[in-house]
Structure formats: structure tokens, C-alpha cells
């Protein structure tokens, strides 16, 4: 049976967390910089533990006003320290609740910049390794962040997005450009199944882009995120694709 991890970014104040949690296998929990706070982190940890969902830190830029989605030019030393800080905060809460972290996935523009910037990606990978070398580093399939994880001898998990458009080189279409979001549910499900089963996706310009789909991201902040999550789970179940971290 084919297996796929299904993850969502939670603890960001979007209100769907309790309903999304039973549908996913991994939760990326906001660590207080781009969203969330100590209380939401604790609530998210408890929800994940209650549903047997793998927990991961979701560090981002300290940019609440823009939800961590605006580019920031910070030195690698700052990226390292802020990543370490956020992982440590969530790990402490998880430990106090009787759990432990399984992975780290950067958020928003930190994620996007690390996909292309080797120095930034190295800073994140170094922080993960120095905190706990057993943690899985999650990044965009084929990106610099995945290569950084390999350089630092971390386990990595290559990610694809159910509702995002792709460029021919496997990068995501920037949110500011046409085709960034796949808004038709049928198309999004079909594209996701193709990425998981065939390892390819049709890019914005019509070319095929190769992707290694080890985990699929569901965005929890969309208006119909819950309904789409259920549809995608049904599609996986119908094809005997096991959802598991």
C-alpha cells in the first residue's frame, strides 16, 4: 500500500484546528513569531497528542503584521538563533505535556527563501541539528532546504502543496502572481494525486515538473479548508493510499 504524510499548519488562529486534526498525520505548530503564542502552542500540542498526530515546530519570521509572508533579509546567525528559539519553545511545551517533536517545517517567506538561498537553508538545518539531530526537516521538494538537510545529515521530507501552482523548475508560483492558488477542488485533488502517484505536476506554463511527494501540505486558513481536507482524504482512501507520518 502506498503511504503519504498529510500535514497542515496549525496554531495560527484560523479556527479549524480541532476539526482538521483528525484528518491529518502531521501538524506544523506556529511558535509565536508569525502567529500563535504560548497558550495556542499548548492547545495545539494537546490536540495533536489526543489524535495521535505527529507534532512539528513551524518557525517563521517575526512578522505578525504580514503573517510571516513578507521577505526579510536577515544574517544567517539571526536565522539560526530565531529558529533554535522557536523550536525550543515548542519542544518544552510538548515535553511538559508528555510528547515530543517529530519534525521542523519553516513557515511562509522563511520557507520560500530557504528553498532558494543555501546560506539561509544551512542556518535552519544547523539549528535543527544542534537542537535534536533526530528531527525531520521538511522543505519544498527538490529545494535548497532539502539539500541543506542532507548536508547536515538530517532526515528530510520533501513536500508538495495541494492548492498551489508550480513553475517549470518545481518552485511554487509566488502568491502575488496569477496561478498561485488552485481554487477548483477537483483540479486540486487531481493534481495532488498525480504528484503522489506519478511524481509530477503540470506547471503554470504547461510543462511537466518533477516532484518527489513525501508529504502533502493542506492549508488550514482557507475558507473551505475543512471540506477540501475531507475530499482529499476520501480520494486517498479510495485509492488505498495510507495517510501516515
Curated annotation (Swiss-Prot):
InterPro entries, per the entry: Glyco_hydro/deAcase_b/a-brl (IPR011330), LamB/YcsF/PxpA-like (IPR005501)
TM ranges: none
Entry keyword Manganese: no
One matching Pfam family: LamB_YcsF
GO terms for biological process, alphabetical: carbohydrate metabolic process
Catalysed reaction equations from the record: 5-oxo-L-proline + ATP + 2 H2O = L-glutamate + ADP + phosphate + H(+)
Domain of life: Bacteria
Keyword Metal-binding attributed: no
GO molecular function: 5-oxoprolinase (ATP-hydrolyzing) activity; ATP binding
Keywords, in A-Z order: ATP-binding, Hydrolase, Nucleotide-binding
E.C. code: 3.5.2.9
Similarity field: Belongs to the LamB/PxpA family.
Chain's role: Catalyzes the cleavage of 5-oxoproline to form L-glutamate coupled to the hydrolysis of ATP to ADP and inorganic phosphate.
PANTHER family reported for this sequence: 5-OXOPROLINASE SUBUNIT A, UNCHARACTERIZED PROTEIN YBGL-RELATED
Subunit (UniProt): Forms a complex composed of PxpA, PxpB and PxpC.
Stated name of the protein: 5-oxoprolinase subunit A
Source taxonomy: Bacteria, Pseudomonadati, Pseudomonadota, Gammaproteobacteria, Enterobacterales
Gene: pxpA
Amino acid at each position: 500500500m502506498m503511504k503519504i504524510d498529510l500535514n497542515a499548519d496549525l496554531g495560527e488562529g484560523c479556527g479549524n484546528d480541532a476539526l482538521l486534526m483528525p484528518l491529518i498525520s502531521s501538524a506544523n505548530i506556529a511558535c509565536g513569531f508569525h502567529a500563535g503564542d504560548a497558550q495556542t502552542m499548548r492547545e495545539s500540542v494537546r490536540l495533536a497528542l489526543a489524535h495521535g498526530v505527529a507534532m512539528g515546530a513551524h518557525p517563521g519570521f517575526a512578522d505578525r503584521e504580514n503573517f510571516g509572508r513578507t521577505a526579510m533579509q536577515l544574517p544567517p546567525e539571526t536565522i539560526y538563533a530565531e529558529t533554535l528559539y522557536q523550536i525550543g519553545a515548542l519542544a518544552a511545551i510538548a515535553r511538559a505535556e508528555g510528547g515530543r517533536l517529530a519534525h521542523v517545517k519553516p513557515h511562509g517567506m522563511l520557507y520560500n527563501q530557504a528553498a532558494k538561498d543555501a546560506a539561509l537553508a544551512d542556518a535552519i538545518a544547523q539549528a535543527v541539528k544542534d537542537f535534536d539531530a533526530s528531527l525531520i526537516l521538511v522543505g519544498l521538494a527538490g529545494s535548497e532546504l532539502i539539500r541543506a538537510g542532507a548536508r547536515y545529515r538530517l532526515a528530510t521530507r520533501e513536500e508538495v502543496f495541494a492548492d498551489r501552482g508550480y513553475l517549470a523548475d518545481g518552485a511554487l508560483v509566488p502568491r502575488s502572481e496569477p496561478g498561485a492558488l488552485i481554487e477548483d477542488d477537483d483540479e486540486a485533488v487531481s493534481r495532488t494525486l498525480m504528484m503522489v502517484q506519478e511524481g509530477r505536476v503540470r506547471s503554470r506554463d504547461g510543462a511537466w515538473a518533477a516532484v518527489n511527494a513525501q508529504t502533502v501540505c493542506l492549508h488550514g486558513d482557507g475558507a473551505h479548508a475543512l471540506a477540501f481536507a475531507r475530499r482529499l482524504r476520501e480520494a486517498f482512501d479510495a485509492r488505498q493510499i495510507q495517510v501516515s507520518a
